[in-house]
């Protein structure tokens, strides 16, 4: 769980969401991208995982057996490779980490937002992506994250405007961004 905090911009990027779970006496930690997950299925999985009627033991002993018995609504797999975990979270599936286990459960409950994504009329391109932004920030950040699957991609949300208090997102890739320029932008 500590490694996840080091690899993902948890608490910094608004579209990265987490949830603490308690599976009996065992702590779990879920990570996903807001807008990429089917929330109804996730809620059912969370409910089943934490249901005291299903908890025979207060401690999870075998992660494979636990996964097979408790997760029936989604495709689930195990991995102990952090590159695989990061790649999966950033491409749609979410991850469930359970304290005391080296393996993570990858939950494929992805649901990409859809809308007729048209090429902007005023900005024709000859090469590259032809996606156009829409009205909702979450949808737009999902469009970007589908193309750039870097764990260093961060979206910081800020309010601008004295009266309108409009939400804007500052998007950048840690390690590539000019920190001085980023600080200047944050203060504007």
Residue ranges and their predicted role:
Residues 1-188:
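Membrane-embedded alpha-helical signal segments
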